[in-house]
Design a protein with these regions (language model features):
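Conserved catalytic alpha/beta core of Sir2/sirtuin-type deacylases, generalized to analogous enzyme cores
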Residues: 2-137
């Protein structure tokens, strides 16, 4: 997700595979701008060099950031438990990340079956928001 809601909810280490709307960069010189700069711009946001300022998000046919992929894979590979939720597991490469999990506890929360055959210790067939909102920590 590109909206930063995981961070607002308190998540400390988020691998934003598809980027973030809170970071924006010039397509010409690479200079970064924050979301406020884009909001205050009239029309298409422009850099001081004249280039177009684009949200740092992955659009169709654009590649994912290799460093972000590496971080996500390493985190999954070293995890003891993995919770998968709210995904069809259809879109790659993210759907394939589960193959790196070597831990002993796997849980899936999803309102429908996933496209990938997963041998989970726990499967809950319901919307993830409904289930997670019931958890008291």
């Amino acid at each position: 997700n590109i909206d930063g809601l995981h961070q607002l909810a308190g998540s400390k280490r988020v691998y934003e595979l598809h980027g973030s709307i809170h970071r924006n960069y010039c397509m010409n010189c690479g200079k970064f701008y924050d979301a406020q700069y884009v909001k205050k711009s009239e029309g298409v946001p422009k850099c001081s060099c004249g280039g177009v300022v684009k949200p740092d998000v992955v659009l169709y046919e654009e590649g994912l950031d290799e460093e972000t992929i590496r971080g996500a894979v390493e985190a999954i590979a070293s995890a003891d438990m993995l919770l998968i939720g709210g995904t069809s597991l259809v879109v790659y490469p993210a759907a394939g990340f589960i193959d790196y999990f070597r831990g002993s506890r796997l849980a899936v929360i999803n309102k429908s079956e996933t496209a990938k055959n997963i041998r989970s210790e726990l499967t809950i067939s319901a919307p993830i928001g409904e289930i997670l909102s019931r958890i008291k920590v």
